[in-house]
Amino acid sequence: MANIKSAKKRAIQSEKARKIIASRRSMMRTFIKKVYAAIEAGDKAAAQKAFNEMQPIVDRQAAKGLIHKNKAARHKANLTAQINKLA
């Protein structure tokens, strides 16, 4: 454990940030899993609806630096291709 006041403060701030980041990452992954679940079920309408809900969340997390923008683009491209195959 830190002894210096500023190091103690940084430890507290880091733990707080870690919890927020973990929560946001979990939320994002949950929305992505919903799209995959709809694709697995073969329901194109549900998959498209889940994708439309997931897309702004992934974009927002990429903009905030939680994930890289290319990873967000890759998720969206792969899911779009899979949804289009359901036709």
Swiss-Prot record:
Family recorded in the similarity comment: Belongs to the bacterial ribosomal protein bS20 family.
The record's GO molecular-function terms, alphabetically, read:
small ribosomal subunit rRNA binding; structural constituent of ribosome
Record has Ubl conjugation as a keyword: no
Q: Which Pfam families match?
A: Ribosomal_S20p
- Enumerate the Gene3D superfamilies for this protein: Ribosomal protein S20
Give the classification, highest ranks: Bacteria, Pseudomonadati, Pseudomonadota, Gammaproteobacteria, Enterobacterales
**Protein origin, superkingdom:** Bacteria
Report which gene this protein is encoded by. Answer: rpsT
One GO cellular component term, please give it.
Answer: cytosol
Keywords (alphabetical) are: Ribonucleoprotein, Ribosomal protein, RNA-binding, rRNA-binding
Q: Under which name does UniProt file this protein?
A: Small ribosomal subunit protein bS20
Source organism per UniProt: Shigella flexneri serotype 5b (strain 8401)
Note the NCBIfam families from the entry. Answer: S20
Task performed by this protein:
Binds directly to 16S ribosomal RNA.
Q: Which GO terms describe its biological process?
A: translation
Q: Which residues form the signal peptide?
A: none
